[in-house]
Amino acid sequence: MIAIIDYGVGNLFSLKSSLAHLGQEAVVTADPAVIRAADRLILPGVGAFGDAMAKLTATGLVPVIQEEAQKKPLLGICLGMQLLFEKSYEYGEHAGLGFIKGEVCPLGPDLADKSLKVPQMGWNALHIVKDDPLFRYIREGEYVYYVHSYYGKNCAESTLAVSDYSIPVTGAVRAGRVYGTQFHPEKSGD
């Protein structure tokens, strides 16, 4: 069973529906016992980094996630991926879950082409930089769906894939059993 971690933000039910379409049993939960009993974890998210970390902390889920990710696969999606990093500079400086070495920074100031819109919203080609089982069903250059204004930076050792948005934008990361995708896999494929 997959536990979709519910901390009050995110695309929880569209994600659960996508997993059901793939024949995967999933439950949306904030219950630590259910999270501990799950085989795999997904940390979704839409919104601001600081608010999301505050909600995870207030619900007592930070230590549960950190402990369980040592034993089973964890996938962070969009903001969920960003939360995997050491810190973020979204509306101040905030500590993250610390699985991925690096930081989450605003996309706009780093863009080489200042005419590009932020947030990056829409389809972009994914370029695989490290082979990984995560890409078993994703081909090099396949288009994936993004909606974000911040991105993972200074994380080369964990970066699995990037997309070009006048700069290489981190598309997927991995550290041990912990994976993250900045793009939305539940909106990107069949």
Question: Which functions belong to the PLM regions below?
Answer:
Residues 70, 103-190:
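Amide-donor transfer/coupling interface in amidating biosynthetic enzymes
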Residues 21-28, 56-59, 125-129, 162-164:
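Short gly/ser/thr-rich secondary-structure transition/capping motifs
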Residues 36-45:
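Short acidic/histidine-rich motifs immediately flanking catalytic phosphotransfer sites
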